[in-house]
Design a protein with these regions (language model features):
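Rhodanese-like catalytic fold shared by cysteine-dependent sulfurtransferases
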Residues: 1-56, 63-104, 113-150
Length: 150
């Protein structure tokens, strides 16, 4: 068997193993569209208003971006790879801010893409009021909302 045919067969096997039975793989744009169809996203002004009303703003940007661009005052900083563990109210590693499943959470990434995927995961944990910021931190800053230096 030629190397190309063997490589194609391996690619197909990997695709089959990682795709739930009965579903075809999708691209990231379609995945985002599907995820976002399940909830209402909010803009910067609405996120600021939500925070004033008690919502938890959660900044999932990585450290280099926070160092470069600053922080949203009052936002909880949680690395993306720890998010579910820190916000699951039933989890043993939860943040003190993770007070219950009814908590309004606004997830913020840099531009509003990774946050949508994070919200899908939080909603699977029962955090049904989780949403994300359209345009992410960059939209927050462009709207002239408060940003603190690191």
């Amino acid at each position: 068997m030629s190397a190309d045919r063997n490589a194609n067969r391996n690619d197909e096997a990997l695709k089959d193993a990682s795709t739930p039975v009965g579903t075809a793989p999708v691209g990231i744009d379609e995945l985002l569209e599907r995820v976002r169809a399940g909830y209402d996203r909010i803009g910067p002004a609405e996120a600021a208003t939500a925070a004033e009303a008690g919502a938890l703003l959660v900044d999932i940007r990585y450290a280099a971006l926070r160092d470069r661009d600053g922080l949203i005052p009052g936002a909880l900083v949680v690395e993306r790879n720890e998010l579910e563990w820190r916000l699951d109210p039933r989890g043993s590693h939860r943040a003190t801010e993770a007070v219950g499943h009814d908590l309004r959470i606004v997830v913020i990434c840099n531009e509003g893409y990774a946050s949508s995927l994070a919200v899908a995961s939080l909603r699977q944990l029962g955090l049904h009021r989780a949403t994300d910021l359209i345009g992410g931190f960059q939209a927050w800053r462009a709207a002239g909302l408060p940003v603190a230096s690191v």
